[in-house]
């Protein structure tokens, strides 16, 4: 869930000004906004309501929340910088009939509809990486496990038709071979299955970084960075 709201360009200018000052007065904020007095009052009031700005006497300054928000600004462009998504990728291993199997998921939502790969999940605000791994496993599979950190994978996805990056993700690779419980076969947005790597070689629709991610998560000590290309139909 996002904890941020879209703000007006004038409000962004006000936050940028306050980012470089301990505090300042109304006249200074009006000057940087380029607006008439009534309009500036409206925008400052809105920033106070959002909890980004505090007023003390005749002075204005950033609140703790405002400092954190304004620090994300690209100060040249005056917009919030777009940043990579940060998530966990779970390598869950078990032995069954003498073979190593891995808990994998078929994605049943866009993007990558129908693709197979390891479970993933975004890290929530204030949540540790280990907490995320345990929560995501429980929510999507019904299983419980303790995880080991095995490495990091920075994956950027480029659209083959336009050449533009459509995704930028940082995955923390988490490994376990001690999962317990009864696995859910389906969840909101996909289905789960235990599969061997040999079975996955015959699977036509799997993420393009699948083997690199799995090997890195199994072996450990990984630092991966790569660009994957997907067409409009694949994405």
Name every feature range the model reports, one short phrase each.
Residues 1-14, 74-75, 80:
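Short alpha-helical segments that sit at the start of domains
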Residues 12, 76-117, 145, 175-178:
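N-terminal strand-loop-strand
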Residues 59-89, 164:
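Acidic, metal-coordinating catalytic segment for phosphate/diphosphate chemistry
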Residues 123-147, 154-210:
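Unchanged
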């Amino acid at each position: 869930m996002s904890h941020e709201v879209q703000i007006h360009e004038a409000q962004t200018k006000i936050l940028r000004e306050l980012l470089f000052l301990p505090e300042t007065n109304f006249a200074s904020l009006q000057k940087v906004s380029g607006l008439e007095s009534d309009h500036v009052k409206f925008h400052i009031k809105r920033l106070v309501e959002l909890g980004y700005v505090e007023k003390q006497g005749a002075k204005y300054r950033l609140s703790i929340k405002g400092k954190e928000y304004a620090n994300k600004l690209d100060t040249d462009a005056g917009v919030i910088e777009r940043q990579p998504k940060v998530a966990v990728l779970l390598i869950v291993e078990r032995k069954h009939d003498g073979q190593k199997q891995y808990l994998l998921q078929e994605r049943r939502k866009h993007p990558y509809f129908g693709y197979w790969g390891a479970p993933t999940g975004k890290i929530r605000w204030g949540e540790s990486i280990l907490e995320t791994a345990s929560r995501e496993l429980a929510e999507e599979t019904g299983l419980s496990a303790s995880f080991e950190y095995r490495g990091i994978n920075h994956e950027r996805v480029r659209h083959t038709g336009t050449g533009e990056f459509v995704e930028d993700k940082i995955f923390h690779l988490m490994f376990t071979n001690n999962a317990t419980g009864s696995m859910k076969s389906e969840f909101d947005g996909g289905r789960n299955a235990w599969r061997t790597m040999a079975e996955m070689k015959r699977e036509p629709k799997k993420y393009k970084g699948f083997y690199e991610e799995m090997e890195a998560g199994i072996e450990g000590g990984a630092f991966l960075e790569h660009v994957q290309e997907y067409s409009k139909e694949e994405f």
